[in-house]
Amino acid sequence: MKTIVFCLVLSLSCLAFGQSPKTPPTLKSILLEQLKTTHNQKEWFVPANTAVEGLTPEQASWRDGKGNHSIGQLANHLVFWNQEELTKFKGEPPVKFDGNNDETFNNFDTKKWNATVQQLDQVLTEWEKAVEAADDKKLESWCSIIAHIGTHNAYHIGQIIYIRKLQGSWDPEKGVK
């Protein structure tokens, strides 16, 4: 019996040794994964691109009458804050902002819905490229902010999905299975 157990352990060890080792995650890979799953990769939740896909300007402007934001306002808010923090990350001068967060929602223009969708995709893509190009020192100093950006995006994407469900414009087949 001891011989069988020994041979089994030895065989499994050889098999494990013969396999290529899994690369351990890095700070960069973790941050990129968080950014991508809130942008265009469906993992634990629906990404932004899927959340806004196929919406008309009218659907994006719809409000529930209870003081909540529209999908367009939420998308506009996401574009603003992602761009604001990306600008800082790149070391560029930030856009003049008086600190009133309400204006990041209220500047939404129904006529510009398609442009807002494109801007959201673009800024999320730019974040991924910027993190990919950044060195470890920069990522270490920014990791908390970037992680919060991913969380912030996921929070508002969840709101977008909820609003779509309320208005009847959400296709459950696009959800996470």
Task: Show where each model-derived region lies.
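Short, contiguous alpha-helical
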Residues: P24, K36-F45, N49-V52, Q59-N101, ...
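Bacterial Sec-dependent N-terminal signal peptides
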Residues: M1-T23
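Acidic/histidine-rich alpha-helical segments that form the ligand environment
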Residues: T104-K137, A147
